């Protein structure tokens, strides 16, 4: 998540980027418990918020918790979607999009197709929400959980190779580590 420092070096942006990056990392490392992944995103947001310039902004971790509580308390998926949209809308501010994407990930219950359909139909900045929630659920469920027709269409339209890209990312896992204070200090000098 330190990659956002070059262009978005604010506490709120660092919290947002760290939450999504750590959620994806937890899923890639094999965590299958959705609540544990959500909790990890909240903890990561708090850690990321320690770095960058302070600007007036909401607390990303608190908003993730609120969004996920909306999903957990809803009587069904449609109520969850309605209430989530009523609270956060489909906007592109990280204070809205990050909590929404993580809540949509939770609502999809590990089902890639359902999660992405919820994101697309949520409205607003649906491609960004789909990319974030899709990265988390895709990392958890694996490439085979993404319908082949979707992979083919995305590869055709965007000249990308999911399998090659995934293999390259997976090869990096042994090199991952949690950034230390000195790592961050070196980057922002």
Please identify what each model-predicted range represents.
Residues 1-12, 18-26, 96, 100-182:
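Catalytic phosphate/nucleotide-handling subdomain of diverse soluble enzymes
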Residues 24-123:
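Accessory "access/gating" subregions that flank catalytic or transport cores
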Residues 183-189:
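Bulky hydrophobic segments
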